[in-house]
A protein has these predicted regions:
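Alpha/beta-hydrolase-fold catalytic nucleophile elbow
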Residues: 67, 114, 140-141, 160
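Short, proline-enriched alpha-helix->beta-strand connector loops that line the catalytic pocket
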Residues: 109, 151-157
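Serine-hydrolase catalytic machinery in alpha/beta-hydrolase-like enzymes
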Residues: 7-28, 32-106
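Gly/Ala-rich beta-loop-alpha elbow adjacent to hydrolase catalytic centers
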Residues: 115-119, 123
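Alpha/beta-hydrolase fold nucleophile elbow
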Residues: 104-116
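A conserved short beta-strand
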Residues: 132-144
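C-terminal catalytic histidine-bearing segment of alpha/beta-hydrolase fold enzymes
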Residues: 160, 165-200
Length: 200
């Protein structure tokens, strides 16, 4: 019998740059549901890094990638301040700008927040301070596990880390969240060092 043709690989995603009034532009991949998926890069990291999983992610909602609010010392990249209220307001404004510009339905009331490294700390803070707006959090490659006082009202938490990255602290954090009765899952990214999403 003839061999079956391999399924076509998905084309890489090309994010759309959307201007936001009185703020930096955001990068957007329109999704298949009305859920906004907020992506926060790492310290001096790459806001386009989410492209590695955008094809899978857009099935769950519209991905909106933000740029940190503080400049790094060298180059043009950015990092995050600890003003969670200001970040939440930035996200709300950006969601509205994306809805207006692209004419797509986005429900701002329930957001998934995804943070990488330093961005995971900001994602944790948003999910802790505003649990109704950020009921689900994905924390990737965090420099520490979530604090014991964090995520008390979260519906679900996913902790991810590269299998070539420091990860014992995140495994232990997952166990602590489980003991607190949280709905939490731990995943390792194959062939991934810090700053990478690996081969999967």
């Amino acid at each position: 019998p003839a061999e079956e043709a391999a399924p076509p690989s998905e084309a890489p995603v090309d994010p759309i740059k959307i201007k936001v009034k009185l703020d930096k532009p955001v990068l957007v991949v329109p999704g298949e549901t009305a859920t906004p998926i907020i992506y926060l890069h790492g310290r001096c990291g790459d806001p386009t890094a989410f492209s590695a999983w955008a094809n899978a992610g857009k099935k769950f909602g519209t991905i909106i990638s933000f740029t940190g609010d503080q400049k790094c010392k060298h180059g043009t990249r950015t990092q995050w301040s600890v003003d969670d209220g200001a970040l939440d307001r930035r996200i709300t404004r950006a969601i509205e700008a994306v809805k207006q510009e692209l004419g797509i339905e986005i429900d701002p009331s329930r957001r998934i927040v995804i943070g990488y490294s330093q961005g995971s700390l900001r994602a944790e803070a948003l999910a802790t301070r505003f649990p109704d707006r950020y009921p689900r959090a994905v924390l990737i490659g965090g420099p520490r596990g979530p604090r014991e006082t964090s995520l008390s009202k979260s519906e679900a938490v996913l902790i991810m880390v590269g299998d070539h990255d420091a990860r014992q602290h995140l495994r232990e954090a997952t166990e602590k969240l489980e003991k607190r009765g949280k709905r939490v899952r731990y995943l390792e990214l194959p062939d991934a060092r810090h700053g990478e999403y690996g081969s999967a």
